[in-house]
Every structure is written in C-alpha cells, then in structure tokens.
Amino acid sequence: MSGHSKWATTKHKKAVIDARRGKLFAKLIKTVEVAAKTGGGDPAGNPTLADAIAKAKSQSVPNDNIERAVKRGSGELAGGVNYENITYEAYGPNGVAILVECLTDNRNRAASDVRVAITRNGGTVADPGSVSYLFNRKGVVLLTKAAGLTEDDVLLAVLDAGAEEVNDLGDVFEVISEATDLHAVRVAAGDADLEITSADISWLPSVSVPLDAEPAAKVLKLVEAVEDLDDVQNVWFNGDISDDVMELVSS
C-alpha cells in the first residue's frame, strides 16, 4: 500500500471479514498464551500480554478462554504448547512483496502449508531478507472517530507516549509509533477516553506496488488462502489497493 493510510484502511476492511472466521478466536488465544509464556501471566507487568488480552476482548473472545490461555502460558494449567515464531517471505502476483507471520508447534508443517498456499495462488516463496527490507515494523493504533474529535486532539493525547504521526482514514484515526511504543500509545489513548478500534504491531511497507482490480483480486485471494492456515497469525503485503479498486474486488 502506498504509505500507511491505505494499508491500515485495507487491514481495517479485511478485519471485518476476518472477524467472521471461526479461526480468529484460536489465533487470538494462541497470541495470549505465547505472551504469558514469554513474559509472565500478570498483564500489569507484561505489556505484550496486556495488548494481546485487549485485542482478544475487542473481538469478543470469552473471558474464560482468555484466562485459561494465560494460565496455560504461565504454567498454572497443564496443556501449554511450545510455539515458535517464524516469518516467511514471498512474492505474489505482480511482484507484490509478502510477509507471513506464523506461531507454530511444528515448523515443518507450517513451512509446507505456507509454501503450498502461496504457490497454488500464483506466488513464490522467497529467501530470508529478500522481502522484509521493504517493510518497517511499527505500532498501529486505530481510534474511533468520535464527533468533534480532531487529529490535533489525538496527537495531543498520544504524542508523549511515542506517537510519530496521526492520519485521518475517514471513519477512524490511525496512530503510528515505533513497535516498542505500541503499549504506551494504547494506554495513553485509553487514558484520554479515546475509543480504540485496534492496536497491533504491523509491518508497514516502505515501497508499494499499485494494483488494478484483476491483480488485486489475485493478491487478496493468495493472502486469504495463507491467512486461513492454522499456523498463520498475520499476512502483510505491499500492494497499493485504492478504495475504488477494493470496492470492485469486494463486490
């Protein structure tokens, strides 16, 4: 996507579709469990866990499920799984760069499944480092655009927490920060009574590839096929899809 705004808009629209998928809960729970295992089960002392719990709750994951995931991760409950973070790099139709983030307990299965999904949909798995340099790891917070709320209001609320820029995306405000400042920005926004739509570590493209309707449809088909895999947590790509093209593809 060209710049941050179009990328966030596309992710925001896709999130509406993704939310209908039954696999979303499982992926969010896995993130909570891994965060608890890595940094402990107390969200007050583990910002990554606090963010994972907040995201799970925002998607209506039941509290009991979240609590069990925290306990499995922290060792209070048996049944915890050793998940591994793996990122795969690929090229899709029209040379679009793709990053695939996985949390898996079976590296061989994840690699095979990702490769098959990519190649069957017109893509090619790339060597490590050949794609990732086209992206920057950032924190992205989306805020509901309440009546009377301006970009300046948002910037004032989150600037001291590490916000780098605020963008007006139409129905939401997007706040960009360093990935390490995501939690602080989310907390600052909450303290200012701003309604948080989402808060995620994101790979934002520094170089984009403009896509018309036909290649956009092919790229999105590939992305959705990869996202459907159980081991896949996130898929990022640098296709620049305008609102008009997105409407054509979605219709």
Curated annotation (Swiss-Prot):
Molecular-function annotations in GO: DNA binding
Cellular-component GO terms for this entry: cytosol
Residues that span the membrane, as ranges: none
Annotated keywords: Cytoplasm, DNA-binding, Transcription, Transcription regulation
Chief localization: cytoplasm
Classification via Pfam families: TACO1_YebC_N (PF20772), Transcrip_reg (PF01709)
Family of the protein in this entry: Belongs to the TACO1 family.
Location in or out of the cell: Cytoplasm
Domain of life: Bacteria
Gene3D superfamilies reported in the protein's UniProt record: 1.10.10.200, 3.30.70.980
Gene Ontology biological-process entries: regulation of DNA-templated transcription
Protein name: Probable transcriptional regulatory protein FRAAL2138
